[in-house]
């Protein structure tokens, strides 16, 4: 496992855990970003920009360090 802020552009991962302040966790959930979602990193320079459920999101690297993910390597892991 790794943290979201450690992924690079083009990486694909599954969200395992979101360990943030309650208000940030609520914002993630209300935006449709939940444990089990598959994400694709669009850019990891500055903010982390990623795609989840056909939507694009941007979060700070500071917030991204609280999101635990498993990097997916093979297509069949999706």
Predicted regions and their residues:
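Conserved hydrophobic positions within beta-strands
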Residues: 15, 38-41
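Short alpha-helix capping/helix-loop boundary micro-motifs
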Residues: 1, 23-27
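Short, surface-exposed secondary-structure edge patches
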Residues: 4, 28-32
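A structural micro-motif recognizing beta-strand termini
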Residues: 18-20, 53
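C-terminal structural segments of small proteins and small subunits
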Residues: 42, 47-78
